[in-house]
Regions:
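Residue-level preference for beta-strand/loop junctions
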Residues: 2, 33, 46-48
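Active-site-flanking beta-strand signature of metal-NTP-handling nucleotidyl enzymes
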Residues: 2-8, 51-53
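Short hydrophobic/aromatic beta-strand element in the GNAT-like acyltransferase core
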Residues: 3, 38-39
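Short, surface-exposed ligand-recognition loops at beta-strand->loop->(often short) alpha-helix junctions
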Residues: 9-20
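Short, charged/polar surface micro-motifs in flexible loops or helix N-caps
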Residues: 12, 47-48, 57-62
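An amphipathic, aromatic/His-enriched active-site/gating alpha helix that lines ligand/cofactor pockets
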Residues: 24, 28-38, 55-90
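Short beta-strand micro-motifs enriched in acidic
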Residues: 42-44
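Short, low-order "capping/linker" segments at domain edges
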Residues: 92-99
Length: 99
Protein backbone atom coordinates (compact mmCIF):
# COMPACT_ATOMS: atom_id res chain seq x y z
CA UNK A 1 0.00 0.00 0.00
CA UNK A 2 1.12 3.51 -0.78
CA UNK A 3 0.11 6.33 1.54
CA UNK A 4 0.28 10.09 1.04
CA UNK A 5 -0.30 12.72 3.72
CA UNK A 6 -1.01 16.34 2.74
CA UNK A 7 -0.92 19.16 5.30
CA UNK A 8 -1.77 22.84 4.90
CA UNK A 9 -3.36 25.82 6.60
CA UNK A 10 -6.34 27.59 5.09
CA UNK A 11 -6.84 31.31 5.47
CA UNK A 12 -9.02 31.88 8.53
CA UNK A 13 -11.78 33.51 6.50
CA UNK A 14 -11.77 30.66 3.95
CA UNK A 15 -11.48 27.60 6.20
CA UNK A 16 -15.24 26.95 6.21
CA UNK A 17 -15.31 27.29 2.42
CA UNK A 18 -12.43 24.82 2.22
CA UNK A 19 -14.35 22.36 4.40
CA UNK A 20 -17.42 22.79 2.22
CA UNK A 21 -15.43 21.89 -0.88
CA UNK A 22 -14.03 18.83 0.90
CA UNK A 23 -17.57 17.79 1.81
CA UNK A 24 -18.49 18.02 -1.90
CA UNK A 25 -15.58 15.69 -2.68
CA UNK A 26 -16.96 13.13 -0.24
CA UNK A 27 -20.47 13.49 -1.69
CA UNK A 28 -19.02 12.87 -5.16
CA UNK A 29 -17.08 9.86 -3.87
CA UNK A 30 -20.23 8.47 -2.25
CA UNK A 31 -22.11 8.81 -5.54
CA UNK A 32 -19.34 7.35 -7.71
CA UNK A 33 -18.08 4.63 -5.33
CA UNK A 34 -14.55 4.49 -6.79
CA UNK A 35 -12.39 1.54 -5.83
CA UNK A 36 -8.73 1.22 -4.96
CA UNK A 37 -8.11 3.85 -2.31
CA UNK A 38 -9.11 5.12 1.10
CA UNK A 39 -9.38 8.87 1.66
CA UNK A 40 -9.69 10.68 4.99
CA UNK A 41 -9.56 14.40 5.78
CA UNK A 42 -9.11 15.96 9.20
CA UNK A 43 -9.70 19.56 10.25
CA UNK A 44 -7.49 20.21 13.24
CA UNK A 45 -8.54 21.93 16.46
CA UNK A 46 -7.03 25.28 15.42
CA UNK A 47 -9.79 25.49 12.80
CA UNK A 48 -7.50 26.30 9.87
CA UNK A 49 -5.17 23.30 9.57
CA UNK A 50 -6.20 20.37 7.41
CA UNK A 51 -4.64 16.94 6.94
CA UNK A 52 -5.59 14.69 4.03
CA UNK A 53 -4.59 11.01 3.99
CA UNK A 54 -4.83 8.88 0.84
CA UNK A 55 -4.05 5.18 0.98
CA UNK A 56 -3.81 3.37 -2.34
CA UNK A 57 -4.73 -0.31 -2.09
CA UNK A 58 -2.49 -2.90 -3.75
CA UNK A 59 -5.19 -5.56 -3.96
CA UNK A 60 -7.32 -3.84 -6.63
CA UNK A 61 -6.68 -4.86 -10.25
CA UNK A 62 -7.71 -1.57 -11.90
CA UNK A 63 -7.84 1.06 -9.17
CA UNK A 64 -9.66 4.34 -9.65
CA UNK A 65 -7.86 7.60 -8.91
CA UNK A 66 -8.93 10.39 -6.60
CA UNK A 67 -7.52 12.75 -9.26
CA UNK A 68 -10.31 11.64 -11.63
CA UNK A 69 -13.13 12.77 -9.32
CA UNK A 70 -14.60 16.08 -10.62
CA UNK A 71 -15.27 17.52 -7.16
CA UNK A 72 -11.66 16.78 -6.18
CA UNK A 73 -10.44 18.51 -9.34
CA UNK A 74 -12.52 21.58 -8.38
CA UNK A 75 -11.17 21.45 -4.82
CA UNK A 76 -7.55 21.32 -6.00
CA UNK A 77 -8.03 24.05 -8.63
CA UNK A 78 -8.44 26.81 -6.04
CA UNK A 79 -6.42 25.48 -3.12
CA UNK A 80 -3.56 27.99 -3.44
CA UNK A 81 -5.94 30.95 -3.11
CA UNK A 82 -7.53 29.47 0.03
CA UNK A 83 -4.26 28.80 1.88
CA UNK A 84 -1.97 30.74 4.20
CA UNK A 85 0.42 27.77 4.27
CA UNK A 86 0.63 25.89 0.98
CA UNK A 87 -0.11 22.17 0.82
CA UNK A 88 2.84 19.90 1.51
CA UNK A 89 2.46 16.31 0.32
CA UNK A 90 4.67 13.58 1.72
CA UNK A 91 4.78 9.86 1.22
CA UNK A 92 4.12 7.94 4.42
CA UNK A 93 4.75 4.44 5.69
CA UNK A 94 1.86 2.74 7.42
CA UNK A 95 3.18 1.41 10.70
CA UNK A 96 -0.08 -0.01 11.98
CA UNK A 97 -3.78 0.56 12.22
CA UNK A 98 -6.87 -0.56 13.98
CA UNK A 99 -10.28 -0.68 12.27
Amino acid sequence: MKATVVRYQAKADRADENQGLIEKVFADLEARQPDGFTYKVFRLADGVSFVHVVIEHDDVANPDSLQDVPAFQAFVAGIADRCDVAPLAMGATIVGGYR
